[in-house]
């Protein structure tokens, strides 16, 4: 790391890492059938592309879904007649009944996620490079590429890598705007923030708490080391960035215009969100909305925010450390990060972020403090506010920030430690991180570190280990090799089992012990531990990470 990296060499290394990451993701496509959310995401995007309607699970905005739908749309995938009112069913129709094959449609949709992976890697590299140098930026990017959870979720049609990528880009551009509040910086900030919010609504609180933390630090640091804040210019450029971000978010739903109410002023949740539930503004908004059609985004964005708020308020069935709960646990995400993060990244990342914070505070340098401040702000918000505890994927943004900390610490220690033994230790940690990809391939999404093994199913399940029986294809092959003619199946997922090459099967119901061949997903077991507790007496065979296979002889 004493090497003087030229800009050309640095960019070349970045390109190589990006190509490697994308190649590893693509190589897993044929291993796994569809994960739980993939059919609905594809259907939602395709209906918007084809018909200008946004129908399914509208708590999620459409940007990532649109990119997932473009490939299948160009391959001829369409929903004929009135779309199925259930998004999962509509998605299954597209996967199994399109001119292109199931594999082609699913692959084309998943390829739509790779641009977000590239944005994530480039943003992490650019942010680290700007304030920590070439060596730290490449080391950080290497750590991020070697994080199985990142590659696992980038290989699936889901919204978590997209929102992580666009939020990282927005935070980087925000710091550039802090440096110099130019109109160009404001336009870039507005565009990236709009795309982040259009990827997933969680970008709003993540960016909000990060901005609040950075502004608080800025105020404290200004008191210690006064600098010109250029307040009038900042207000103007910030207003432009805010308006542009809202316009991008609204425009992502397309040009279709709708009336938010009618002549009878039928109650509208969107209008009530925008103008209040009573008062002069409420009355005026209803009169105008009954006569003037507005872009579809004015209807859908409020519904998205209200949907997420409702979901969070009412909670979601969650599992952690053998316990289930509806409203989750404040410590869910720290535990999830502790068992889902490669140990070199976890240890070096946390220590590196702490080093960044100490150095930034001592030198009154906001830009060196920023990664640690954003990490702490987002994780604290998730712990205190979120009741939707269904996977580390909801805080994936922690990983690029940890990678920045790890990259900075490796370079700092390499330069301080002159001994070969010290350099060997650091090189060993980097190699350990990189080797994780080889040892866990292709089960990146279901990765657990040494803390979580050998029984990860006792710690986390939903979308961390089993996300809709993703190993169904592996099960099909195992049953074929064993010559199984019939079996019992306990399955929680969204594949069309009638279209899969499975032997004859019957549903495995809870509380009804049976004999013969039994296949059951870990999510099925976790959601009804009492009903399937009788299986604990038998030793299963693992099929991938999401299925248990039993053979129980009759009496």
Q: Where are the model-predicted features located?
A:
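Transmembrane-helix motifs of polytopic, lipid-linked glycan transferases
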Residues: 111-131, 169, 173, 354
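Interfacial juxtamembrane loops and adjacent helix segments
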Residues: 54-112, 262-326
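Transmembrane-helix signature of polytopic, membrane-embedded enzymes
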Residues: 10-16, 81-92, 124-146, 179-188, ...
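Signature aromatic-anchored transmembrane alpha helix within multi-pass, membrane-resident enzymes
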Residues: 15-16, 208-215, 238-247, 357, ...
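C-terminal luminal/periplasmic domains and tails of membrane-associated envelope-modifying transferases
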Residues: 280-285, 313-321, 451-555
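Short helix- or helix-capping micro-motifs
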Residues: 17, 140-145, 172, 193, ...
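Membrane-interface transmembrane helices that cradle and orient dolichyl/undecaprenyl
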Residues: 170-186, 220
